[in-house]
């Protein structure tokens, strides 16, 4: 299966979307203040590539604030801690992440296109696999006692299914979706689904079904070439 990679001259702009095997060296953790300032400027330029996905200008700034938090040194990466660390109003950032209207699919399409520009090859490989995060509580969306590959056993946690891409030029993630265990769709979980903002029309899907959806969506975007699909057990 293959989509087409459109040829453009924007290769340099796309480098943040993946790891280029021949050009990237292992980080030495010796960044100077000047390096960090330059990085922040480059991140602003990079975010402008996604401008068309947002309805309002302030959403671009909110997305940049959120990215700063994810890339920062905070031990916890939830919205509240990110907002406090970035001196942003907590409710304002929570609204942006969870409720404000912006085009998620457009963000992914731009991201995938940039991967195609930098890493795309006709015989590239689409990769499907799952990843997990162990959780202590029961309030996180989709959390349940399930197999978590990160610890190699049944544990209380969240599991996501992910689509990646690899070629001789490098590799990158494209998109992921949270796996919602079947018990979460039971009537007794109605209040919890509502509290977590789970869409009312969401239905149970197996991990292979989610992986296939991710793959089909990537093909329909038609901006990344690959001839092979590889998947681990899901």
Where are these regions (language model features)?
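Short Lys/Arg-rich cationic patches that frequently serve as NLS/NoLS or arginine-rich RNA/DNA-binding motifs
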Residues: 1-16
């Amino acid at each position: 299966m293959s989509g087409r990679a459109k040829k453009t001259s924007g290769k340099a702009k796309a480098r943040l979307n993946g790891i280029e095997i021949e050009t990237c060296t292992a980080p030495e953790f010796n960044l100077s203040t000047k390096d960090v300032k330059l990085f922040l400027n480059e991140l602003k330029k990079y975010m402008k590539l996604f401008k068309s996905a947002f309805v309002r200008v302030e959403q671009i700034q909110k997305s940049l604030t959120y990215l700063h938090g994810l890339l920062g040194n905070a031990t916890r990466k939830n919205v509240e801690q990110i907002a406090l660390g970035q001196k942003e109003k907590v409710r304002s950032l929570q609204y942006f992440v969870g409720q404000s209207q912006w085009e998620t699919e457009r963000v992914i399409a731009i991201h995938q296109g940039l991967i195609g520009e930098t890493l795309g090859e006709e015989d590239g490989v689409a990769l499907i696999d799952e990843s997990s995060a162990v959780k202590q509580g029961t309030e996180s969306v989709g959390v349940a006692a399930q197999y978590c590959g990160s610890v190699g056993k049944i544990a209380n946690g969240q599991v996501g299914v992910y689509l990646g891409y690899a070629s001789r030029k490098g590799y990158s993630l494209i998109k992921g979706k949270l796996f919602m265990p079947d018990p979460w769709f039971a009537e007794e979980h109605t209040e919890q689904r509502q509290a977590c903002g789970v869409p009312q029309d969401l239905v149970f899907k197996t991990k292979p079904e989610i992986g296939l959806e991710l793959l089909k969506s990537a093909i329909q975007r038609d901006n990344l070439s690959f001839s092979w699909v590889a998947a681990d057990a899901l």
